[in-house]
Amino acid sequence: EKGRPLLPALQQRTAFLRRLTEDLFLAAKLEQKQVMLNEDRVSLGEVIAAVCDSCREEAEKKGVVLQAPPASELPVWGDQIRLQQILQNLLTNAIHYTPAGGSITVNSRVEAGAALVSVRDTGCGIAPEDQAAVFDRYFHTTTSSKHDSTGLGLTIAQELAHLHHGEILLESEVGKGSCFTLKLPLLSA
């Protein structure tokens, strides 16, 4: 009974260490070009719905509103698990850096033959001098000291996007939030 108050903290630290180990392993595999994609036709709309469903409880616990209007199919060629991982990393970051009472909106659209999925938050934003480095390994913004972070999530997401012949774009303003957009080639009909 004495240790009961420590249990949630221990569970949180254990989850963080597990995530760190998984991220380090995947980052090493990506660096050595050893990640194989199980490619097939994927509906980005379904990926968005699945990832938003999996993150909704975490957002609600923090007091953050997660809005994700139903997305159209948005067919792409890729690895569904890895595409989910990209969006999971973007959405988890948005939740971590958005204060209670804030909001996150996930939108998708087609533009110039590309499928775009944007994760926009009302978080702390990223300073202009930090924006070029956010995809670097182990990078932490000056505002990230209070958050558990491996410093690998955005690196992994960007490298996985590149494996899918895509990229992640960033728009951010300090004090107003950030918008990370996954851009992938749209699969032609």
Q: What are the functions of these language-model segments?
A:
Residues 165-166:
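Conserved glycine-rich
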Residues 38-43, 60, 65-74:
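Conserved catalytic submotifs in the C-terminal HATPase_c
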Residues 44, 125-133:
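Short helix N-cap motif at coil->helix boundaries in the Bergerat
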Residues 12-17:
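Short alpha-helical segment of the dimerization/phosphotransfer core of two-component systems
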